[in-house]
């Protein structure tokens, strides 16, 4: 069972100009206290054919996380258009929101993003060079692709248990018993910037 349960991800200020920051309101529940931080990342896929054009827009650390409900707004700068091939700016691409614990990714939310001119005349007769300040992005927030990966949220417990006592020789399967946790009231968490 996962120690973190994502309860909601809301895309804020959508649609928006291509050059405006991304904002996501993320709500989640922590079912077991975690000693380390959660790492949230936002990645813009610059080209479907070549991942070298992917841009890490922001990475923040949140934590340590105690049992309870949390909500925060994750803001990231827009992608750098100079790092995207001209022919890939207009059209559909993907935005990835990921969450990791101790270097292990356990959640990936993928959104399709449609970048196009808002002006009908520019849509019909696009200029040879993209006018980035006229491009609008629309995140298709109603159809995210959510992928969950099983990870070990408490590897230190297994390591301690393995070194503390040798395993008993038995043909019976030992039950896995977890202690009860106290639920804390809704808490607001400020993300802290990742240290370089």
From Swiss-Prot:
Location(s), subcellular: Nucleus; Nucleus, Nucleolus
SUPFAM superfamilies, per the entry: ASF1-like
Keyword Nucleotidyltransferase (UniProt): no
Stretches with biased composition (Basic and acidic residues): 146-157
Coiled-coil zones: none
Tissue expression from the record: Expressed in leaves and flower buds.
Domain of life: Eukaryota
Region (Disordered): 146-196
Any GO BP: regulation of cell size
Pfam families: ASF1_hist_chap (PF04729)
Keywords per UniProt: Chaperone, Chromatin regulator, Nucleus, Transcription, Transcription regulation
Example of a GO cellular component annotation carried by this entry: rDNA protrusion
Quaternary context: Interacts with histone H3 and histone H4. Component of the HIRA complex made of UBN1, UBN2, ASF1A, CABIN1 and HIRA. Interacts with HIRA.
Family: Belongs to the ASF1 family.
Job of this protein: Histone chaperone that facilitates histone deposition and histone exchange and removal during nucleosome assembly and disassembly. While encoded by a region of the Arabidopsis thaliana genome that is homologous to the Brassica S-locus for self incompatibility, this protein may not play the same role in Arabidopsis thaliana.
Protein name (record): Probable histone chaperone ASF1A
Lineage of producing organism: Eukaryota, Viridiplantae, Streptophyta, Embryophyta, Tracheophyta
